Protein backbone atom coordinates (compact mmCIF):
# COMPACT_ATOMS: atom_id res chain seq x y z
CA UNK A 1 0.00 0.00 0.00
CA UNK A 2 1.38 3.40 -1.01
CA UNK A 3 1.86 5.86 1.86
CA UNK A 4 -0.30 8.98 1.74
CA UNK A 5 1.37 12.33 0.94
CA UNK A 6 2.34 13.90 4.29
CA UNK A 7 1.93 17.52 5.31
CA UNK A 8 1.93 19.28 8.69
CA UNK A 9 1.73 22.61 10.47
CA UNK A 10 4.63 23.53 12.76
CA UNK A 11 4.17 25.88 15.70
CA UNK A 12 4.46 26.28 19.46
CA UNK A 13 1.78 26.08 20.69
CA UNK A 14 -0.05 24.39 17.82
CA UNK A 15 -2.78 22.24 19.41
CA UNK A 16 -5.35 24.98 18.69
CA UNK A 17 -4.55 25.10 14.96
CA UNK A 18 -7.50 24.67 12.60
CA UNK A 19 -5.22 23.86 9.66
CA UNK A 20 -5.95 20.08 9.69
CA UNK A 21 -9.71 20.66 9.37
CA UNK A 22 -9.19 23.23 6.63
CA UNK A 23 -6.89 21.00 4.58
CA UNK A 24 -9.26 18.08 4.99
CA UNK A 25 -11.91 20.18 3.25
CA UNK A 26 -9.46 20.95 0.44
CA UNK A 27 -8.80 17.24 -0.10
CA UNK A 28 -12.54 16.63 -0.46
CA UNK A 29 -12.62 19.23 -3.24
CA UNK A 30 -9.62 17.68 -4.99
CA UNK A 31 -10.86 14.13 -4.41
CA UNK A 32 -7.68 12.81 -2.81
CA UNK A 33 -6.43 11.52 0.54
CA UNK A 34 -3.49 13.12 2.34
CA UNK A 35 -2.09 13.02 5.85
CA UNK A 36 -1.97 16.41 7.61
CA UNK A 37 -0.92 16.77 11.25
CA UNK A 38 0.18 19.25 13.89
CA UNK A 39 3.80 19.27 15.06
CA UNK A 40 4.68 21.21 18.21
CA UNK A 41 8.40 21.88 17.81
CA UNK A 42 10.56 22.81 20.79
CA UNK A 43 11.35 26.52 20.81
CA UNK A 44 15.01 25.72 20.11
CA UNK A 45 14.30 22.62 18.03
CA UNK A 46 12.44 23.88 14.95
CA UNK A 47 15.20 23.22 12.41
CA UNK A 48 15.68 19.65 13.64
CA UNK A 49 11.93 18.96 13.66
CA UNK A 50 11.57 20.19 10.08
CA UNK A 51 14.61 18.23 8.94
CA UNK A 52 13.24 15.03 10.50
CA UNK A 53 9.81 15.61 8.94
CA UNK A 54 11.13 15.97 5.40
CA UNK A 55 13.74 13.20 5.78
CA UNK A 56 10.95 10.78 6.75
CA UNK A 57 8.70 11.49 3.78
CA UNK A 58 7.14 14.90 4.41
CA UNK A 59 6.07 16.74 1.26
CA UNK A 60 5.16 20.20 2.52
CA UNK A 61 4.63 22.20 5.70
CA UNK A 62 2.86 25.22 7.06
CA UNK A 63 4.68 27.31 9.65
CA UNK A 64 3.03 29.45 12.30
CA UNK A 65 4.10 31.45 15.36
CA UNK A 66 6.87 31.65 16.49
CA UNK A 67 8.86 30.01 13.69
CA UNK A 68 8.23 32.05 10.51
CA UNK A 69 11.58 33.86 10.63
CA UNK A 70 13.40 30.60 11.38
CA UNK A 71 11.63 28.98 8.45
CA UNK A 72 12.89 31.82 6.25
CA UNK A 73 16.47 31.13 7.39
CA UNK A 74 16.02 27.39 6.89
CA UNK A 75 14.77 27.59 3.29
CA UNK A 76 17.29 27.08 0.48
CA UNK A 77 15.18 29.11 -1.97
CA UNK A 78 12.56 31.84 -1.48
CA UNK A 79 9.66 33.25 -3.44
CA UNK A 80 9.60 37.00 -4.06
CA UNK A 81 6.79 37.27 -1.51
CA UNK A 82 8.86 35.52 1.13
CA UNK A 83 11.87 37.73 0.41
CA UNK A 84 9.76 40.87 0.77
CA UNK A 85 8.12 39.62 3.97
CA UNK A 86 11.30 38.29 5.54
CA UNK A 87 9.23 35.37 6.80
CA UNK A 88 8.02 31.99 5.54
CA UNK A 89 4.74 30.24 6.35
CA UNK A 90 4.92 27.58 3.62
CA UNK A 91 7.70 25.07 2.90
CA UNK A 92 7.83 22.62 0.01
CA UNK A 93 10.44 19.95 -0.65
CA UNK A 94 11.55 20.28 -4.27
CA UNK A 95 12.55 17.35 -6.47
CA UNK A 96 16.21 18.41 -6.20
CA UNK A 97 16.01 17.96 -2.42
CA UNK A 98 16.02 21.67 -1.60
CA UNK A 99 13.49 23.43 0.60
CA UNK A 100 11.62 26.35 -0.96
CA UNK A 101 9.98 28.91 1.29
CA UNK A 102 6.94 31.02 0.43
CA UNK A 103 4.65 33.41 2.29
CA UNK A 104 0.93 33.16 1.57
CA UNK A 105 -0.39 35.39 4.38
CA UNK A 106 -0.84 38.40 2.11
CA UNK A 107 -2.66 36.33 -0.52
CA UNK A 108 -5.00 35.01 2.16
CA UNK A 109 -5.85 38.50 3.40
CA UNK A 110 -6.30 40.09 -0.01
CA UNK A 111 -8.37 37.22 -1.43
CA UNK A 112 -10.69 37.35 1.57
CA UNK A 113 -11.21 41.10 1.17
CA UNK A 114 -11.48 41.25 -2.63
CA UNK A 115 -13.02 37.88 -3.60
CA UNK A 116 -15.10 36.83 -0.59
CA UNK A 117 -16.15 40.26 0.66
CA UNK A 118 -16.08 41.89 -2.81
CA UNK A 119 -14.33 45.02 -1.56
CA UNK A 120 -11.80 46.52 -3.96
CA UNK A 121 -8.39 47.56 -2.63
CA UNK A 122 -7.37 49.54 -5.70
CA UNK A 123 -7.68 53.27 -5.09
CA UNK A 124 -8.56 52.83 -1.41
CA UNK A 125 -6.86 54.28 1.67
CA UNK A 126 -5.68 51.53 4.00
CA UNK A 127 -4.60 51.75 7.65
CA UNK A 128 -2.46 48.97 9.12
CA UNK A 129 -2.31 48.78 12.92
CA UNK A 130 0.80 47.00 14.21
CA UNK A 131 4.31 46.52 12.85
CA UNK A 132 5.14 42.90 13.62
CA UNK A 133 5.68 39.94 11.33
CA UNK A 134 1.99 39.54 10.52
CA UNK A 135 1.76 43.08 9.16
CA UNK A 136 5.09 42.94 7.34
CA UNK A 137 3.98 39.74 5.62
CA UNK A 138 0.88 41.30 4.03
CA UNK A 139 2.23 44.69 2.88
CA UNK A 140 3.81 43.46 -0.41
CA UNK A 141 0.56 41.86 -1.63
CA UNK A 142 -1.55 44.83 -0.54
CA UNK A 143 0.75 47.09 -2.59
CA UNK A 144 0.29 44.88 -5.66
CA UNK A 145 -3.42 45.81 -5.60
CA UNK A 146 -2.58 49.52 -5.99
CA UNK A 147 -4.30 51.23 -3.07
CA UNK A 148 -4.20 55.02 -3.15
CA UNK A 149 -2.39 55.08 0.18
CA UNK A 150 -1.16 52.71 2.89
CA UNK A 151 -0.61 54.14 6.38
CA UNK A 152 0.98 52.14 9.18
CA UNK A 153 0.69 52.96 12.88
CA UNK A 154 2.19 51.13 15.83
CA UNK A 155 2.47 51.59 19.58
CA UNK A 156 6.25 51.92 19.11
CA UNK A 157 6.38 54.48 16.30
CA UNK A 158 10.00 53.69 15.37
CA UNK A 159 8.95 50.19 14.26
CA UNK A 160 6.24 51.64 12.04
CA UNK A 161 8.77 54.07 10.55
CA UNK A 162 11.13 51.18 9.82
CA UNK A 163 8.48 49.30 7.82
CA UNK A 164 7.36 52.51 6.13
CA UNK A 165 10.89 53.12 4.85
CA UNK A 166 11.30 49.50 3.79
CA UNK A 167 8.08 49.38 1.75
CA UNK A 168 7.62 53.00 0.67
CA UNK A 169 4.45 53.61 2.68
CA UNK A 170 3.53 56.19 5.36
CA UNK A 171 3.98 55.93 9.13
CA UNK A 172 1.76 58.01 11.43
CA UNK A 173 1.81 57.96 15.26
CA UNK A 174 -1.29 56.21 16.64
CA UNK A 175 -2.31 59.30 18.59
CA UNK A 176 -2.31 61.40 15.39
CA UNK A 177 -4.68 59.21 13.36
CA UNK A 178 -7.85 61.13 12.53
CA UNK A 179 -9.85 59.15 10.00
CA UNK A 180 -10.29 59.05 6.25
CA UNK A 181 -9.55 55.33 5.95
CA UNK A 182 -11.56 52.96 3.75
CA UNK A 183 -10.06 49.76 5.17
CA UNK A 184 -8.57 49.39 8.65
CA UNK A 185 -6.61 46.19 9.36
CA UNK A 186 -5.62 45.27 12.89
CA UNK A 187 -2.40 43.27 12.99
CA UNK A 188 -1.65 43.81 16.68
CA UNK A 189 -1.82 40.94 19.15
CA UNK A 190 -3.72 42.95 21.77
CA UNK A 191 -6.98 41.15 21.15
CA UNK A 192 -5.51 37.96 22.62
CA UNK A 193 -5.60 39.72 26.01
CA UNK A 194 -8.67 41.87 25.30
CA UNK A 195 -6.66 45.04 24.64
CA UNK A 196 -7.48 47.66 22.02
CA UNK A 197 -5.02 49.68 19.93
CA UNK A 198 -4.73 53.19 21.37
CA UNK A 199 -6.54 54.94 18.51
CA UNK A 200 -9.18 57.66 18.27
CA UNK A 201 -12.60 56.00 17.78
CA UNK A 202 -13.33 58.62 15.11
CA UNK A 203 -11.07 56.80 12.63
CA UNK A 204 -13.84 54.24 12.04
CA UNK A 205 -16.44 56.83 11.07
CA UNK A 206 -15.99 56.52 7.29
CA UNK A 207 -14.49 53.01 7.35
CA UNK A 208 -15.90 50.54 4.79
CA UNK A 209 -14.24 47.52 6.43
CA UNK A 210 -12.53 46.94 9.78
CA UNK A 211 -10.59 43.68 9.70
CA UNK A 212 -8.75 41.80 12.45
CA UNK A 213 -6.07 39.38 11.27
CA UNK A 214 -6.77 37.00 14.15
CA UNK A 215 -9.95 34.95 14.22
CA UNK A 216 -12.58 33.91 16.73
CA UNK A 217 -12.94 35.35 20.21
CA UNK A 218 -9.57 37.12 20.10
CA UNK A 219 -10.86 39.43 17.35
CA UNK A 220 -14.12 40.46 19.01
CA UNK A 221 -12.84 43.29 21.24
CA UNK A 222 -11.47 45.17 18.23
CA UNK A 223 -14.38 44.35 15.93
CA UNK A 224 -16.99 45.41 18.50
CA UNK A 225 -15.08 48.67 19.06
CA UNK A 226 -14.90 49.33 15.32
CA UNK A 227 -18.55 48.54 14.69
CA UNK A 228 -19.84 50.62 17.59
CA UNK A 229 -17.85 53.59 16.28
CA UNK A 230 -19.14 53.52 12.73
CA UNK A 231 -17.37 50.84 10.68
CA UNK A 232 -19.77 49.72 7.93
CA UNK A 233 -18.54 46.10 8.00
CA UNK A 234 -16.28 44.13 10.33
CA UNK A 235 -14.54 40.79 9.89
CA UNK A 236 -12.19 38.52 11.77
CA UNK A 237 -9.33 36.73 10.03
CA UNK A 238 -10.93 33.33 9.44
CA UNK A 239 -11.13 34.00 5.70
CA UNK A 240 -7.47 35.02 5.70
CA UNK A 241 -6.58 31.77 7.49
CA UNK A 242 -8.47 29.68 4.94
CA UNK A 243 -7.10 31.76 2.06
CA UNK A 244 -3.46 31.43 3.05
CA UNK A 245 -3.99 27.69 3.55
CA UNK A 246 -5.52 27.40 0.07
CA UNK A 247 -2.52 29.18 -1.44
CA UNK A 248 -0.18 26.79 0.40
CA UNK A 249 -2.21 23.82 -0.85
CA UNK A 250 -1.86 25.08 -4.42
CA UNK A 251 1.92 25.42 -4.01
CA UNK A 252 2.16 21.82 -2.81
CA UNK A 253 -0.35 20.12 -5.07
CA UNK A 254 -1.14 22.42 -8.01
CA UNK A 255 -4.83 22.42 -7.08
CA UNK A 256 -6.63 25.66 -6.18
CA UNK A 257 -9.39 25.10 -3.59
CA UNK A 258 -12.57 27.21 -3.50
CA UNK A 259 -12.26 29.00 -0.16
CA UNK A 260 -15.88 30.16 0.20
CA UNK A 261 -17.49 26.84 1.22
CA UNK A 262 -14.55 26.09 3.51
CA UNK A 263 -14.97 29.43 5.31
CA UNK A 264 -18.65 28.64 5.85
CA UNK A 265 -17.79 25.13 7.05
CA UNK A 266 -15.27 26.49 9.56
CA UNK A 267 -17.74 29.09 10.84
CA UNK A 268 -20.21 26.31 11.59
CA UNK A 269 -17.78 24.27 13.71
Swiss-Prot record:
Q: Its pathway?
A: Metabolic intermediate biosynthesis; chorismate biosynthesis; chorismate from D-erythrose 4-phosphate and phosphoenolpyruvate: step 4/7
Which InterPro entries has this protein been placed in?
Aminoacid_DH-like_N_sf, NAD(P)-bd_dom_sf, SDH_C, Shikimate_DH, Shikimate_DH-bd_N, Shikimate_DH_fam, Shikm_DH/Glu-tRNA_Rdtase
What broad class of enzyme is this? oxidoreductase
Which EC number(s) does the record attach to this protein? 1.1.1.25
Q: What GO cellular component entries does it have?
A: cytosol
Transmembrane portions of the chain: none
Which biological process terms from the Gene Ontology are attached to this UniProt entry? amino acid biosynthetic process; aromatic amino acid family biosynthetic process; chorismate biosynthetic process; shikimate metabolic process
Tree of life domain: Bacteria
The residues that hold shikimate are 17-19, 64, 89, 105, 215
Q: Where is the signal peptide?
A: none
Keyword set, alphabetical order:
Amino-acid biosynthesis, Aromatic amino acid biosynthesis, NADP, Oxidoreductase
Could you say which residues bind NADP(+) here?
A: 80, 130-134, 154-159, 213, 237
**Sorted alphabetically, which NCBIfam families does this protein's record hold?**
aroE, PRK00258.1-2
SUBUNIT field: Homodimer.
Specify the protein name: Shikimate dehydrogenase (NADP(+))
Task: Supply the source organism for this entry.
Answer: Neisseria polysaccharea
Amino acid sequence: MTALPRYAVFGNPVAHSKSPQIHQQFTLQEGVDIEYGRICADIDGFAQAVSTFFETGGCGANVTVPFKQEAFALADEHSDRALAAGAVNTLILLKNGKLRGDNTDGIGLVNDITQVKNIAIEGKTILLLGAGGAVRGVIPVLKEHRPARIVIANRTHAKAEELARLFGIEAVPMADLNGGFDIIINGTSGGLSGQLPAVNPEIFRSCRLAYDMVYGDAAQTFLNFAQSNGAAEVSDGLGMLVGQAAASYHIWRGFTPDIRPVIEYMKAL
